[in-house]
Regions:
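Short hydrophobic beta-strand segments
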Residues: 319-324
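Terminal transmembrane helical module of multi-pass membrane proteins
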Residues: 297-303
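Active-site pocket-shaping loop/turn-to-helix segments
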Residues: 292-295
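Electropositive, gly/pro-rich neighborhoods at or near active sites that engage anionic ligands
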Residues: 10-163, 167
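N-terminal signal-anchor transmembrane alpha helix of single-pass membrane proteins
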Residues: 1-6
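Conserved mixed alpha/beta catalytic, RNA-binding, or beta-rich assembly cores of soluble enzyme
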Residues: 116-290, 301, 308-315, 326-332
Length: 332
């Protein structure tokens, strides 16, 4: 037991170090944009200790609507806090600071949970608690290291791996006119392979993910005759798979809490619309850090796959939707 405790203790020390570093880095970024250092410190500490209570799931009916409302409230609250702490920032700067705060919140939460079980195990002498921590620690540490590496990437404002979907959507849209159809989400109308294509992505170049599900729902309801929906996104690779590998599948390629995917599935099912997915494989760390060359190069393969899919699964003059899913940091 002593050896296990020592091993867990070392990992906990590393987590604590990452937690302190992330807090200091994000705090410095906020202070740089503010005139009131003490205000920033106090408000930032409040944010770090904030929490979200999920809706009751005993009766699952309507839980998606409740969850969406809670998450929208959380996002609005964080945006208000950032605006309160800083001065005269545009939407791009605010979204990047929000991303940085969210990363710091994630590392802080991981550290506090591991610390809790470590202390509980030592206090009670319960070997099972310590053994369980040891089993999950490799995954926790991998995720924490990924979050820690994301901070300089976010500060640099360069595209991250998760931005591959918006990057492809941007390449497809070219110089066509875009309009914001729902919150932080834009739509471009183009012609591709003799089809009328509606290109959807989050609004860049800030660190937004938008509401692609809501945007797709709106387009389908407005047009009524959509024949195909294609989602393009980053996907978590399995060990042994190559970064930048492209794969095709059925369904909606979109992560997160499930709200946007639910909307895509619901509208596609109700209207009998075929919905397909094309993804680029990458690790969690590669998804939230500066976009690797292998991932960037996969954009051309994705473009080819999109055109092939359009030809195979739709006909001339039909209306289709192509959604680039992911974080638009550094992608216009």
């Amino acid at each position: 037991m002593f050896m296990i405790l020592r091993n867990v203790g070392k990992k906990l020390s590393r987590l604590e170090q990452m937690n302190v570093n992330s807090k200091n880095t994000v705090l410095e970024s906020l202070i740089e944009k503010s005139d009131d250092k003490e205000l920033v410190k106090n408000r930032f500490n409040r944010l770090l200790n904030s929490f979200v209570i999920p809706p009751v799931s005993i009766d699952p009916k309507g839980i998606i609507v409740k969850l969406e409302h809670i998450l929208n409230t959380q996002e609005d609250n964080m945006k208000d806090e950032i605006q309160l702490m800083t001065k005269d920032l545009d939407d791009v700067e605010i979204s990047i600071l929000m991303n940085l705060v969210e990363v710091s919140l994630g590392i802080n939460l991981m550290y506090k949970y591991i610390r809790h079980f470590y202390i509980s195990g030592k206090k009670t002498g319960n070997m099972m608690i310590i053994a369980q921590i040891q089993m999950i620690l490799p995954q926790i540490m991998e995720q924490a290291e990924a979050y820690n590496a994301a901070i300089p990437s976010l500060k640099s404002k360069k595209p991250i791996g998760d931005g591959i979907g918006p990057l492809v959507a941007s390449k497809l849209s070219g110089e066509s006119e875009s309009k914001e159809v729902v919150r932080d989400t834009i739509l471009n109308e183009i012609t591709i392979e003799n089809r009328n294509a509606f290109i959807i992505k989050a609004k860049g170049p800030g660190g937004n993910v938008g509401k692609p599900g809501e945007a797709i729902k709106k387009v389908v309801e407005d047009k009524k005759d959509i024949s195909l929906i294609i989602t393009i996104d980053a996907a978590l690779k399995l060990e042994g798979e190559d970064t930048g590998e492209v794969a095709e599948g059925i369904g909606a390629a979109i992560g997160g809490p499930g709200i946007e995917r639910y909307k895509i599935e619901e509208i596609a099912t109700n209207n009998k619309i075929k919905y397909l997915a094309i993804v680029t494989k990458m690790s969690e760390k590669e998804a939230i850090t500066e976009m690797k060359t292998e991932i960037e190069k996969s954009a051309e393969i994705l473009l080819t796959k999109v055109k092939e899919t359009i030809k195979q699964h739709s006909k001339d003059n039909q209306n289709i939707i192509i959604a680039g899913i992911g974080n638009t940091l550094g992608v216009k």
